[in-house]
Design a protein with these regions (language model features):
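Flexible "cap/lid" loop of the alpha/beta hydrolase fold
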Residues: 142-174
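Catalytic active-site module of serine/aspartate enzymes centered on a nucleophile-bearing elbow/loop
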Residues: 276-308
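Conserved alpha/beta-hydrolase "acid-adjacent" motif
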Residues: 259-265
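Short beta-strand/loop motif that positions the catalytic acidic residue
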Residues: 246, 252-254
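Gly/Ala-rich beta-loop-alpha elbow adjacent to hydrolase catalytic centers
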Residues: 120-124, 128
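Conserved HGGG/HGGXW glycine-rich cap/lid loop of the alpha/beta-hydrolase fold
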Residues: 42-88
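Conserved acidic catalytic loop of the alpha/beta-hydrolase fold
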Residues: 99-116
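Alpha/beta-hydrolase
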Residues: 162-167, 171-241
Length: 308
């Protein structure tokens, strides 16, 4: 029994080291740095065409932004920043969505981009919304993808005691996150990605792989913890964003069974933003499982409608 336990421990340690080495390789040399009023900001570029900024969601970074926008890079030049507290980006004392929006304007100055479409997923929708409000002359189109926001004075995401304990256990610990993601990936997809894991059995291989990739790319979780906690605060706090002031053409996308309740949020936003278009699929969860191609198609058609 002792020898078996030692062997199992050695295997686990080796598997963990291999995963972290692969993660470091995946992140290395893919991103760039720019100076902003809030400090350094990490970003990556993919594709060619009209510029579109893809602002990642909770637990992300530039790598998640690239994944969210990978189909769009066939049509657009995707700019994928790491928001405050994620990977190599700064975490200033003011890490509000408004401050993040202003820092993104500085990033665009560095890239010599005057105007572009802006998409924000999950908690990234807060920053996208603030960008549209604060920099209306620079935002040609706005896409709010599974928007995580408190529009009613009631946090739409409520974890039970066991869920909260699990989340707290993995935040900041790469080992704990890796172990739980390896041993109970479906439970992690439900808890962290707010998606019914039963959907994995009803979608094609590419979509199952995408779900697994989103989960795997939360590593290193320790380099995203500040951003995760910041997102939890701002997405649960009553939104101060003047959504009614948004003038850019707006597309809002969600799934009815999103366990973070973004379908209800999407409907409220569609009522507040003049002329907003709304699409809600019956199922797909918070990572719109089974609808990645649909999301890309909706965004491309929406953005292209106003361009010759």
């Amino acid at each position: 029994m002792g020898a078996a336990a030692l062997a199992g421990g050695a295997w686990a340690a080796g598997a963990y080291r291999a995963r972290m080495a692969a993660t470091e390789t995946r992140l290395a040399l893919r991103s760039h740095m720019a100076e902003t009023r809030a400090g350094p900001m990490e970003y990556a570029l993919a594709g060619q065409g009209r510029p579109l900024m893809m602002i990642h969601g909770t637990g992300g970074g530039f790598d998640q932004g690239l994944l969210f926008g990978h189909r769009l890079s066939e049509t657009f030049q995707v700019i994928a920043p790491s928001r405050f507290g994620y990977l190599r980006s700064a975490f200033p004392s003011d890490a509000s969505p408004a401050a993040q929006a202003n820092a993104l304007a500085d990033l665009l100055d560095n890239l010599h981009i005057d105007r572009l479409s802006v998409a924000g997923g999950s908690a990234g929708a807060l920053t996208a919304g603030e960008f549209a409000v604060r920099h209306p002359d620079r935002c040609t189109h706005l896409v709010l993808l599974v928007p995580a926001a408190n529009l009613t004075g009631h946090d739409p995401v409520e974890f039970g005691a066991l869920q909260r304990a699990a989340v707290d256990a993995v935040l900041g610990s790469d080992v704990a996150f890796w172990a739980l993601a390896s041993l109970a990936p479906r439970q992690m997809i439900r808890t962290l990605l707010a998606t019914d894991p039963a959907l994995l059995d009803r979608v094609d291989t590419a979509e199952r792989d995408r779900a697994e990739t989103i989960l795997a790319q939360l590593l290193p979780i320790s380099a995203r913890t500040a951003g995760l906690r910041n997102d939890a605060h701002w997405s649960g706090t009553p939104s101060p964003i003047a959504w009614e002031d948004i003038a850019a053409p707006t597309l809002i996308l969600s799934c009815e069974d999103d366990l973070f309740g973004t379908a209800a949020t999407a409907r409220l936003l569609a009522d507040r933003i003049a002329g907003a278009r709304l699409t809600i699929w019956p199922e797909g969860g918070h990572i719109w499982l089974g609808h990645d191609a649909d999301v890309a198609r909706e965004i491309a058609a929406f953005d292209g409608a106003a361009h010759p």
